[in-house]
Amino acid sequence: MIRTQDAGALRAENVGQTVTLAGWVANRRDHGGVAFIDLREASGVVQVVIRDEQVAHHLRAEYCLAVTGEVTRRKEGNENPNLATGEVEVVANEVEVLSAAAPLPFPISDHVDVGEEARLKHRYLDLRRSGPNNALRLRSKVNKAARDVLDRHDFVEIETPTLTRSTPEGARDFLVPARLQPGSWYALPQSPQLFKQLLMVAGMERYYQIARCYRDEDFRADRQPEFTQLDIEMSFVEQDDVLAVAEEVLVALWKLVGHDVPVPLPRMTYAESMERYGTDKPDLRMGQELVDCTAYFADTPFRVFQADYVGAVVMPGGASQPRKQLDAWQEWAKQRGAKGLAYVLVQDDGELTGPVSKNITDGESAGLAEHTGAKPGDCIFFAAGAPKPSRALLGAARLEIGRRCDLIDEDAWSFLWVVDAPLFEPTADATASGDVALGYSAWTAVHHAFTSPQDVDGFDADPGSALAWAYDIVCNGNEIGGGSIRIHREDVQKRVFAIMGIDEAEAQEKFGFLLEAFKYGAPPHGGIAFGWDRIVALLAGTESIRDVIAFPKSGGGFDPLTAAPAPITPEQRKEAGVDARPQQDLPPQS
């Protein structure tokens, strides 16, 4: 080893020792012909004193050095309480430049704001800053904590293929040409879903993997085309068994940041979550639940409220908003695909004003504040129309109100299981939300096609009412994991495919290997996958998952560091068989 001691480990008890350190010049100060250098490396920072001006003259920020010298106690009054090494310094008698540094594109400092594009282009420099550096170290601890829990429960860590066949799972695949079979293609997996089910058929019983997954999605804020999930699958289990293991993992992870997660975690049905919060991932760090006003306005003359659903959410103190701000709410709603956001203002004397107040009856006005829980000085926002989009608009408004009115307790951790989700949803709803609907019928899977229905015998009689053994874990309004009890019978899987418009021939072509496996005594099984990037971002206290990924992509999947994706040469294109046709064309996929 070049170094004999970690710089950040030096303390008063090391005074008098001769040590060799190695690291980077984080900062330099000159005083009376003496150079004081903050030497930074993974363990921390220590001050190095260089009295030889000729040696110190050429040293600049981020030079990589090896320093040999004696550990001495700092003079009284010169201690630095902000450094763990602040009682001591190293007086150098030998300095070796291991590598010089060119002028920096930005300062290596946690106190200077740098544009994300520059940070990602020079990510290797960005990671020298303590914030990004600590985030990756936290990620490593998170990995270990999860492994420790699962190892105690006799789980087996197994790697599944990253070159497989294209099997629709709800998003577009990244495709890889197979050079040895021109015209044929591998796909990078969107998840290990089918392989982990096959491992249950294989008798592994308890599997996990910190898995890389790939989805070729349209650009969405804070999404990555390649991401990581903690993937877990268990045989001979029911929903409660999976949730108990998942909660044990969460307890271990949040303990890393000093928080005790109280278990068992609360549960709420999907239907209740949508009714009360307008979303299946509610943030429970604030109140302001949605209020159903459909029955209240059942006989209203106001045509806008003559709808299948009328709902409201209250903005505390919102009546004092100027007209310009109220108009801005309309634009906010239109950006979300709505026509606007109706409102009434509850004045200090209880009188209702605003556009809606002029269109409803005196009787409706008289009891509206009480019905919605509004107080004098509040604003009541409304949405009317089909239940799902109207609730979604109010749910988004609720969160926006929480942010604008400081209603969210930023220091709190709020966990919730959302259970009993629908098995199917209208295909039009899935495509409208940006998902790739699997199948060709009016119905597609809410989670994926391998989720077990709760009513195995009767789910296909009324697909729109069928419930799934599916569960999502929500933390502070973020979905951080989701899973289900899986289908383990060939006949049930075929019936689910049929509801989705996948006939037997297509099912065999795309999923024949899974259906074949189900013929050989497949055990009941279920599992969960945690969104690892999101969890680490929450634990690190950062807004973006890009901050906890070593080399993330920017918007649209572009990598500023390597300039990927990039064109390939004509020779590469020919060799890979990109334009070749397979010997036998496959039917078009959904």
Swiss-Prot record:
Which residues make up the annotated site Important for tRNA non-discrimination? H31, G77
Q: What keywords would UniProt list here?
A: Aminoacyl-tRNA synthetase, ATP-binding, Cytoplasm, Ligase, Nucleotide-binding, Protein biosynthesis
Q: How does it assemble?
A: Homodimer.
Q: Where is this region: Disordered?
A: 556-590
Its top-level enzyme class, in one word, is: ligase
What the protein does comes down to: Aspartyl-tRNA synthetase with relaxed tRNA specificity since it is able to aspartylate not only its cognate tRNA(Asp) but also tRNA(Asn). Reaction proceeds in two steps: L-aspartate is first activated by ATP to form Asp-AMP and then transferred to the acceptor end of tRNA(Asp/Asn).
**What residues does L-aspartate bind to?**
E169, R215, H447, R486
Protein's cellular compartments: Cytoplasm
Please give the name of this protein: Aspartate--tRNA(Asp/Asn) ligase
Q: Which Gene Ontology terms describe the biological processes this protein takes part in? A: aspartyl-tRNA aminoacylation
Homology family? Belongs to the class-II aminoacyl-tRNA synthetase family. Type 1 subfamily.
UniProt lineage: Bacteria, Bacillati, Actinomycetota, Actinomycetes, Propionibacteriales
User: Known catalysed reaction(s)?
Assistant: tRNA(Asx) + L-aspartate + ATP = L-aspartyl-tRNA(Asx) + AMP + diphosphate
Q: What is its EC number?
A: 6.1.1.23
| Source organism of the structure | Nocardioides sp. (strain ATCC BAA-499 / JS614)
What SUPFAM superfamilies does the record tag this protein with? Class II aaRS and biotin synthetases, GAD domain-like, Nucleic acid-binding proteins
Residues where ATP binds? R215, D216, E217, Q224, E479, G531, W532, D533, R534
Q: Report if keyword Aminoacyl-tRNA synthetase is assigned.
A: yes
CC per GO annotation: cytoplasm
Pfam families associated with the record? GAD, tRNA-synt_2, tRNA_anti-codon
